[in-house]
Each structure stands twice: as structure tokens, then as C-alpha cells.
From Swiss-Prot:
Binds 3 Mg(2+) or Mn(2+) ions per subunit. A motif (DDXXD motif) lies at residues 350-354. The Asp-Asp-Xaa-Xaa-Asp/Glu (DDXXD/E) motif is important for the catalytic activity, presumably through binding to Mg(2+). Pathway: Secondary metabolite biosynthesis; terpenoid biosynthesis. It comes from Arabidopsis thaliana (Mouse-ear cress). Mg(2+) 2 binds at residues 350, 354. It is found in: Cytoplasm. This is Terpenoid synthase 26. Its main location: cytoplasm. Belongs to the terpene synthase family. Tpsa subfamily.
Length: 598
């Protein structure tokens, strides 16, 4: 049944510039009716009071065990100072190992060391040295690769260059193929070589067909190696971990959680490097606890638990965890705390539209945020809605106050504009959901890609990141280039696949899975399969765009790809934001609770 509306609302929507068919692989359908570029809706307030409450559909979500966990924690500042002193003393020794010698073999060794630094969580200590090594080595690739027949070495060199945005041809792996055109079976017993090739294969683009073959080849054989018991136990565990989360798609801060214990059990590990990694990681853990004491105190003072109905996700610590995907180094507490506050604004906005607000309330909130001030109808709305609106507006006022002295007011203004856009997307989906409407898949994705908050999240990251965002950075984001469009689509589909059962359990049918099932007449499992194919293709496009995008600063491209890594961790077979009790809880425990031993 179609929803009926009364007074009118007009909201702006930006048309996507990257055609959907280029990602989805099937032709766009022509639809008649109202254009999505300029929706005019009529609203009515016929339902009031108890009648309004009786039709709400929402699941009460459990209170998080983390919200008050860190209030009583005490961090010893003198311990942190001692760790910094030890790190400062060891850093020159490690730097000397990286940069001391010259020549092709030495360049090759330095590039191999980059993989170790990233894996141990130490890359941020040596960014200049890493960039210099790769810049100098890029012109020597052919010489380095000439006659190199070690699979592990070739794979890691390939991985290092592509990881940092340098294009190197995947043809370097043709030397490992036999006369039959397949990868040589003799490679299958070389566990570390196979593991390195597996990691490298995840950096493939749409044209790297050999890497698609490599991924298939290594995946099956690594599973066998890990299961058969021929590998050392610590290597088998490591293989199982990377099969679940390849390093390329992992949050950078989570990689050393698993790799440091693995490296410690390697017979040829470097004691200085291992000690440096442990000291660095422990300092990070202490800094995170300090941050969490601040953000959870801020969150407690908002009093959401007593002021709002229990429809929202009580996820302040989860918000902070996801911030670490893009800002994890110890000196950036200020930026992490601000971004956590921003993520909280996005989360309460999404929950209000998605899980609780009636249509008249959704219209009033959308109009108020479009005006960036309460509209006339807001006075007639429930108190909870006024609290949500006031929280968002006041939080941005604080951002403005903090950043204006630094000459960064434009970042707040640009972020507000993206916040308005995601509000529009939330409203559009809420309108469909209230009407129990399942649109065409393409129509849904056009709206859903904005609603999923990728662009608004990136705007907040730009606002908070250390390398001050420029107006050009925001213009790039606003133009919705292929990089951004693809990331939006990937996030939308992963969210809808992993959250499908939750959506259906609360009567929320406006979902990519339902849209695809309806349009193409397929089953749920068939829809999952087809949508996952789109996601696999999207991963290749993201790699391609990271390597080929020009005129955009590397820090902006890296932040964008780090967001892709956050999305991978959030939806890796589960919906990790709404239900962080499983794997996400394990990750948070490893970072915030289980202190690394020295």
C-alpha cells in the first residue's frame, strides 16, 4: 500500500556521475515516474501520541558492556614516558638496518623490510624512509627482478610497490608458470612463498588475470597446508588468519596483533625489531585507553540512555575502534576523539531514521538538518527527536570552535554539506521502508550508496586528519569519482548482505537483496551469490583506482582505502557494527584489554 502524505518537503539529491552498469555488469532499466533528483513529498501528522508509538517497529538493542568499562582504568603516564624513551633509543638502530647499505641487493632487502615493518605495526615510524626506498627502487624494478626466482621475494616486492601506490606489472609472476600455462605444482610445498603470493594476489586490478589465477591457486593449497599438519603450528595459525583476513584488506592496527606473536616464534626473528614492535604496540594500547576514558566520559554526559528510547546502538567504544582504521598512531589522540564524536553523530542519525522515527518525524528531522536549524514542525515533535537534532547541531558547533583558529572552518562547512546529503539518503530509504516499498535494484543503489555514509564518513575523516584537508580534497569527494562510487557500492552491498536477517526480522524490506530478488526473480542465496560477484569486482576496481588516480594527494587516497579496510572488517561474514559481540569484540579485546607482554 502506498504511503499518503500531507504538507510538502523538497530535498536536493546529487546525481551519480559514474554509471551503475559499469560496476554491476547489466544494463540499466528505464523507469518512469518522479525523478530522484528532486523529490517532493507530502507529510501528515494524523498519528499522534499513543497511536504513533503503537506503530513503531524497532528492536531494543542490548546495552554495550564497553560503555562504562574504562571509567575506572588508570594509565600510568610515567610508564608511557618510559616506553617513548625506549622507542626513541631503538629507532636509530632499526633505521640503520633499513637504510644503511646500497646496491641492488640492498635495495631489494630494504623493500622486503617494508613488508616486515607494516606487519609488525612499525611503518608509521619510518614513513619517509619507506617512501624514499620505494621511490629510488621504482626505477630499478627490472634490474631487481632479473633472474629472481624466489616466489616469496617477488611477491613481497610486488606487494610493497602496489601497497604504496606504485604500479608494477603482474607479469612478474609469469616466471612461476609451467609449460601448460598453470602455476607450477612444485610451488605448493613452499608455504611462505605461497602465502606471499596469496597476499600479493589481493592487490589485483580488473586486468590482472594472472592474479585471479594466483588467488585461486594459493587459496586451495594454503587451506590444505594449514590443515595437514606439515607446517609448524604457528605458521598454520598464521595461514588460517590471513585466509580469513588478507593483510591488504585488514585494518593496519590489527595486523600486528596477530603478526607479532607469529614473528616471535620464527627461528630467524630479529630481537631488536621484535622488541621495538612490542614497545610500540604497548604504547599504542596505553594511549588508546587514555582516549577511551575521555570519549566514554563525553558519551556518558550526553545521557542518551535516560533521554532517548532504546532504539539506538550503544556503540561509543565500537565507534572509537573503527576510527583506528584511519587514525591509529599515538600522537593523534585529538583527531581520534573528534572523529569518534563525529561517528556518533552519523550513528544516531542512521538509527533514528532506520530504526525508530515515524515518517512525519523523519520529514521534520530531514528538513531541520537541511536548514541546519529546527524547522517549524519540530516544536510539535517528540522530545527525543529534538534531543537528536540538538546533539548533532551542538557537536558541529564544537568542531567549528576547535578548527576555526586553525583556519579550517571550510572543512566543517564541507562536512556539514556531506552530512546533509547522507540525511537525504536516510530520509529516502525511510520513506520507502514506511511504504514497505521494494524499488528496482538500480534505483535502490542510487539512493542506498549515499545513505550508507561512505562519503559523509570520508568528509569527517578529512576534517579530522593530521594532513590538513584542502578544498580540492573535498571537491574530489563531492565529484563522486569512480573510486568513491565503487567504495559506496561495496559498502552498501556488504551491509545489506550481512544485515539481511536483522532487516527482515524487524520488517525492513528495503534492502539490496530484496530488490535484486524481486527484479531478477531469483532466490535469496542466488541473490547473495550475484551480489558477492559484484563485490569481488569492486575490490579490483578499488585497487585500480588507488593506483591510477592522479591529481589527488596520497594521504587522501590512503584514507579512502583505509576506509575500505574498515568496511571489510565490519562486514566480514557478520554485521560488526550493529552486533559487535563476536569477532569485533575479539579485536577490541586484543587492542584495549589484553596488554602485550614485553
Amino acid at each position: 500500500m502506498e504511503a499518503k502524505f500531507g504538507s510538502q518537503i523538497s530535498l536536493h539529491f546529487r546525481t551519480n556521475s559514474f554509471p551503475l552498469r559499469k560496476l554491476y555488469g547489466f544494463p540499466l532499466t528505464t523507469f518512469s515516474g518522479t525523478s530522484l533528483n528532486h523529490l517532493r513529498l507530502k507529510a501528515t501528522n494524523t498519528l499522534k501520541g499513543d497511536d504513533q508509538e503503537s506503530i513503531r517497529k524497532f528492536k531494543k538493542l542490548p546495552t554495550s558492556e564497553w560503555t562504562h568499562y574504562f571509567h575506572s582504568f588508570v594509565v600510568d603516564v610515567s610508564e608511557m614516558d618510559a616506553l617513548r624513551n625506549e622507542i626513541d633509543a631503538l629507532k636509530p638502530k632499526v633505521k640503520n638496518t633499513i637504510m644503511s647499505s646500497q646496491g641492488i641487493d640492498s635495495t631489494k632487502k630494504r623493500i622486503l623490510m617494508i613488508y616486515m615493518l607494516v606487519s609488525l605495526g612499525l611503518a608509521h615510524h619510518f614513513e619517509e624512509e619507506i617512501y624514499e626506498t620505494l621511490r629510488d627502487g621504482f626505477g630499478k624494478i627490472e634490474e631487481m627482478m632479473e633472474d629472481e626466482d624466489d616466489l616469496c621475494t617477488v611477491s613481497i616486492i610486488f606487494w610493497a610497490f602496489r601497497r604504496y601506490g606504485h604500479y608494477i606489472s603482474s607479469d612478474v609472476f609469469r616466471r612461476f608458470k609451467g609449460s601448460n600455462g598453470n602455476f607450477k605444482e612444485s610451488l605448493t610445498g613452499y608455504a611462505k612463498g605461497m602465502l606471499s603470493l596469496y597476499e600479493a594476489a589481493h592487490l589485483g586490478t580488473t586486468k590482472d588475470y594472472i592474479l585471479q589465477e594466483a588467488l585461486s591457486f594459493t587459496s586451495s593449497h594454503l587451506e590444505s597446508l594449514a590443515a595437514c599438519g606439515t607446517c609448524p603450528p604457528h605458521l598454520s595459525v598464521h595461514i588460517q588468519n590471513v585466509l580469513s583476513v588478507p593483510q591488504h584488506w585488514n585494518m593496519e592496527i590489527l595486523v600486528p596483533v596477530e603478526y607479532i606473536p607469529f614473528y616471535e616464534q620464527e627461528k630467524d626473528h630479529d630481537e631488536i625489531l621484535l622488541k621495538f614492535a612490542k614497545l610500540s604496540f604497548k604504547l599504542l594500547q596505553l594511549q588508546y585507553i587514555q582516549d577511551l576514558k575521555i570519549v566514554t566520559k563525553w558519551y556518558k554526559e550526553l545521557e542518551f540512555a535516560s533521554k532517548l528510547p532504546p532504539y539506538f546502538r550503544d556503540n561509543i567504544v565500537v565507534n572509537y575502534f573503527y576510527v583506528l582504521a584511519v587514525i591509529y598512531t599515538p600522537q593523534h589522540s585529538y583527531e581520534r576523539i573528534m572523529l569518534t564524536q563525529y561517528f556518533t553523530c552519523l550513528a544516531i542519525l542512521d538509527d533514528t531514521f532506520d530504526r525508530y522515527a515515524s515518517l512525519p518525524e523523519a520529514i521534520s528531522l530531514a528538513n531541520s538538518l537541511e536548514r541546519w536549524a529546527p524547522n517549524d514542525a519540530m516544536d510539535k515533535q517528540p522530545d527525543y527527536l529534538k534531543i537528536v537534532l540538538n546533539f548533532i547541531l551542538k557537536t558541529f558547533e564544537v568542531f567549528q570552535k576547535e578548527l576555526e583558529p586553525e583556519g579550517r572552518s571550510y572543512t566543517v562547512k564541507a562536512t556539514i554539506e556531506e552530512f546533509k546529503t547522507v540525511t537525504k539518503g536516510n530520509f529516502d530509504l525511510a520513506k520507502w521502508a514506511h511504504a514497505v516499498h521494494v524499488p528496482s535494484f538500480e534505483e535502490y543503489m542510487e539512493v542506498g550508496e549515499e545513505e550508507i555514509s561512505v562519503c559523509s564518513t570520508l568528509a569527517g575523516i578529512f576534517m579530522c586528519m593530521e594532513q590538513k584537508a584542502t578544498k580540492e580534497d573535498y571537491e574530489w569527494l563531492k565529484s563522486r569519482p569512480k573510486f568513491i562510487q565503487t567504495l559506496c557500492a561495496r559498502c552498501r552491498l556488504k551491509n545489506d548482505i550481512t544485515g539481511f536477517e536483522d532487516d527482515m526480522s524487524r520488517g525492513y524490506v528495503t534492502n539490496a537483496v530484496n530488490c535484486y530478488m524481486k527484479q531478477y526473480g531469483v532466490t535469496k542465496q542466488e541473490a547473495f551469490g550475484e551480489l558477492n560477484k559484484i563485490i569481488v569486482e569492486a575490490d579490483k576496481i578499488l585497487n585500480e583506482e588507488f593506483l591510477t588516480t592522479v591529481g589527488v594527494r596520497h594521504c587522501v587516497l590512503k584514507a579512502t582505502f583505509d576506509l575500505a579496510r574498515m568496511i571489510f572488517i565490519t562486514y566480514n561474514g557478520y554485521e560488526g557494527f550493529t552486533y559487535p559481540q563476536g569477532k569485533i569484540k575479539e579485536y577490541m579485546t586484543s587492542l584495549f584489554v589484553d596488554r602485550i607482554g614485553l
